[in-house]
Amino acid sequence: MTKTQMNYIAGDWVSGPTEIENINPSDLSEVVGVFAQASSDQLEDALDAARRAQAEWATYGLERKQNVLMAIGNELMARAEELGTLLSREEGKPLAEGKGEVFRAGQFFTYFAAEVLRQIGDTADSTRDGIEVDVRREPLGVVAIISPWNFPTATASWKIAPALAFGNAVIWKPANLTPASAVALSEIISRQDIPKGLFNLVMGAGRDVGQRLVESPKIDAISFTGSVP
C-alpha cells in the first residue's frame, strides 16, 4: 500500500479529510504517491501558526537566518539527482531537466542566503531642522505562495527563499499535479532551525485551498504564478 504524503502545518505533518493519487504521466501504471488535501480548518490553523511564528522569526539574527537558507540550498544541490528524478516521474520532464531544475532551486536559496547579510537601510537629512530620515525595510508578515506545475521546485524556491530571507512566514500551496516535489522540498525546510509554523505546506485544488488562501484577511502578500479559469 502506498503511504499517504501529508501536509505540513504548524510544525507537524498532518493528514487531510481527502486524498488524491499522483500518476506518472509517462507511465500511467505507476502511482507516484498519494497526497492529503488540506481542509479549510487546517488552512486556518496554518494561517494562525504562521502569524505567531513570523513574530519570532523577525527576532532571529541575520547570520542565523542565513544559515537556514544556506542549508536548504546546499541540500537541494547535493540531492539534485534524486529529487530531479522524482520531479521527472511526476511531471514528465526529461531527467536532465528535472535534475537541473532542482540544482537551480538550490542556487536560489544560497543566493538569498547571501542577500540576508546584505540587508541595508539608509539615512538622509530632513528639510526640517534637527530631524533625520531613517529608511529601513521590514517584513510584510504572512506570505501566500501559489506555484505552478511546470517548474514545481524552481519557481516555488524562487518565491519561498526571498520570503523567508527577509523575515516573512510562508503558506505554500503547490500545484496539485506535482505534490511529490512539494513534499520533498517541504521536508528539507521542516528540518531547519525555524519556528514552528513559519513554513506551511497546504495541498489542495486551486478552487478550494487556493481560493480561500487569496481571500483570507490573514494574508499580507500573495505571490502567484499560474492560470485561473
Regions found by a protein language model. Name each.
Residues 1-34, 67, 71, 121-146:
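Terminal low-complexity tails and localization/encapsulation signals of metabolic enzymes
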Residues 7-9, 21, 33-44, 193-198, ...:
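Histidine- and aromatic-rich ligand-binding microenvironments
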Residues 8-9, 54-58, 76, 164, ...:
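Hydrophobic residues in alpha-helical segments
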Residues 19, 34-37, 56, 74, ...:
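Short N-terminal micro-motifs specific to bacterial/archaeal maturation
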Residues 28-119:
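Glycine-rich loop-to-alpha-helix module at the N-terminal edge of alpha/beta enzyme cores
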Residues 121-229:
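Rossmann-like NAD(P) dinucleotide-binding subdomain of oxidoreductase/dehydrogenase enzymes
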